[in-house]
Structure formats: C-alpha cells, structure tokens
Amino acid sequence: MSFPNSSPAANTFLVDSLISACRSDSFYSSSASMYMPPPSADMGTYGMQTCGLLPSLAKREVNHQNMGMNVHPYIPQVDSWTDPNRSCRIEQPVTQQVPTCSFTTNIKEESNCCMYSDKRNKLISAEVPSYQRLVPESCPVENPEVPVPGYFRLSQTYATGKTQEYNNSPEGSSTVMLQLNPRGAAKPQLSAAQLQMEKKMNEPVSGQEPTKVSQVESPEAKGGLPEERSCLAEVSVSSPEVQEKESKEEIKSDTPTSNWLTAKSGRKKRCPYTKHQTLELEKEFLFNMYLTRERRLEISKSVNLTDRQVKIWFQNRRMKLKKMSRENRIRELTANLTFS
C-alpha cells in the first residue's frame, strides 16, 4: 500500500484510524473500492492535495499486478491559497521586499538576496538599524542578485549604507567632496603657480625695456666712439674706472641692432684694445715676455695706453701662452699613445 509523498503523518487521527483498521481486519472491506484518508476539517494549512482510491481485496488473495492507485485531487481550496508556480510559499517580513531564491533540496538555500549570512545581518543591523529599509532602492526586485554558494560578493547595498553612515562625520564628507571634485581642491595651488608665472613674465618685459633703450642709443654711441678714443689716446689716464667705462660702452655698441640674419653666434669677446695697439703689444711680447718698468712706460706712451693696461695685457698674454702650451703637450702625448 503506497501513500502520496505530500501526505503528512502529523495528524494523529489519520494514523490511528489506519492502525485500527489494519488490526480489526476491517481494512479489507467487501466494497468495490476504498477511500482513504477520510476528510478532516482540522488539517490546517498543511492539508493533503491528493488522495488515493485503492481497489478492495479479499482475504488471502494474491496481489494483482495491474492494481494501482487512482489519484484524485483533494482539498482544492489549497491551490488558490498558494502561488500558481509554487507548491508552497514562505512569508517574508514586511521590511524585506526582496524575493527569495528557491533551489533544489541538495543545494544549500539562502534566504537573503544580497548575499549576507545571518551573522553578517546581525552585525550590520547593530551598526545600521535601518538597513533593510534602505535596501530596496539599491537592490531592485525586478532584477535580484542570485546568491552563488561558495562566493561572497560585496553588493552595492553595503557601499551605499557605508557612505550614508560616513557622511554624518565632517571628515568623511570632506574626503567625499574632494574625491568628487578634485579640480576644486587644486585651485589654490594653481592660482599660486599662475601668480608666479605672471611675475616671471613681467620681469622679462621690464628687462627688455632698458635693452631697447640701449639699442636706440647705440647708433649715437657709435658716432661718438672714435672721438672719445682719440681723446683718450691724447690724454692718458691711469685710473681703472675709466677703462671699465670704456669697455662697457664698447660692449653696448657691439650689440646687434640689425636683424637675426647678420647676428653672430657665441659669446661676444671683450676687446678694449684696437688692432694697432694689439699688434704693437704682440711684437713686444714676442721680443720679451717680461717687461721692466722703464720699457713698459715707453710702450704705454707709444701705444697711447696706461702703464696698468700694458701690465694687465702682458699678464693675460702669458696665461694664454701657458694654456696653449699645456694643450699642445697633452695633444702630443695622446697622439703618441696607442689604445688597444
């Protein structure tokens, strides 16, 4: 004798009636069929949805092979109580609007959609009491997340809850605002850098103005330079300040006033001596590298230079000769050596 799988054995009335029928041999009735179990009104919500009709057998009759149980619907009002697609429904709390995900019996079923265990829910509920009321916005019912066994994913609900919790503190709000608007935080630094750049741009402009004035004055200086040189040649002055002024005026006159095509590359050399003066000094230097005081005075009068100017020129010429001789010696040594 077989029973349907959905029939519960929790009702004592049904179990007792079956046992008594088997003991009193009233189980084998002479009627054409037997109806079991009898209907009862106190079955509650866990009622049987099917019932079986078994054909009756006489005593000591061999069980027929083709005998089977005819299944008929029982308690039809239960079908309207449940969903059409489900056989049983578990009521959800009022705060949880997320539907549960059903699995087969051999798979561990989780009741929550957002992938949190019971322990995790308890911990979070202690920190954020209104967690379940904030969930439906971030976890929509239309496209719920399916919990995968063995994995833990940090859903968006946890992030939104944390950000709402942190936004109460001023530090958290400031950091969030800095992350949302990084350009606004860098504005003071940019303004300081812009001020420095403006200062640097203003300095060259102010520096270019005196150069323009010197360029304008340079043609006049060129015209007056030969006269000044002739006057200096006639009247010999021993002060070094006059020499420095003369060299500065020559440097100003040498500044290129023409366009960039005629400009010369490289550093402009100081040439306070004329070609005639340098030629006479070079002749004397080849004859004698070191001068006495009397000979130096004679040369200074002949070349229209001061005693100090002639002395400095000879010192510089000796240093130049020394440098040239050193370079020539190094060049000869490197030429004789063979590198493997």
Swiss-Prot record:
Free-text function comment from the UniProt entry: Sequence-specific transcription factor which is part of a developmental regulatory system that provides cells with specific positional identities on the anterior-posterior axis.
Source organism: Homo sapiens (Human)
Involvement in disease: Vertical talus, congenital: A rare malformation characterized by vertical orientation of the talus with a rigid dorsal dislocation of the navicular, equinus deformity of the calcaneus, abduction deformity of the forefoot, and contracture of the soft tissues of the hind- and mid-foot. This condition is usually associated with multiple other congenital deformities and only rarely is an isolated deformity with familial occurrence.
Family membership: Belongs to the Abd-B homeobox family.
Keywords: Developmental protein, Disease variant, DNA-binding, Homeobox, Nucleus, Phosphoprotein, Transcription, Transcription regulation
A GO molecular-function annotation: chromatin binding
Top-level taxon of the source organism: Eukaryota
Documented effect of changing residue 319 to K: In CVT; also in Charcot-Marie-Tooth disease-like foot deformities
PTM-bearing positions, type Phosphoserine: 238-239
Entries under SMART domains matching the protein: HOX (SM00389)
Tissue: Strongly expressed in the adult male and female urogenital tracts.
Biased segments, Basic and acidic residues type: 242-253
Localization (cell): Nucleus
InterPro entries: HD, HD_metazoa, Homeobox_CS, Homeodomain-like_sf, HXA10/ABDB-like
Pfam families per UniProt: Homeodomain
A GO CC term assigned to this protein in UniProt: cytosol
DNA-binding region: 266-325
Name of the gene: HOXD10
Region (Disordered): 200-268
GO BP annotation list: adult locomotory behavior; anterior/posterior pattern specification; embryonic limb morphogenesis; embryonic skeletal system morphogenesis; forelimb morphogenesis; hindlimb morphogenesis; negative regulation of cell cycle; neuromuscular process
Repeat is among the record's keywords: no
Record-linked PROSITE patterns: HOMEOBOX_1, HOMEOBOX_2
Compositionally biased residues, Polar residues: 208-217
Name this protein carries in UniProt: Homeobox protein Hox-D10
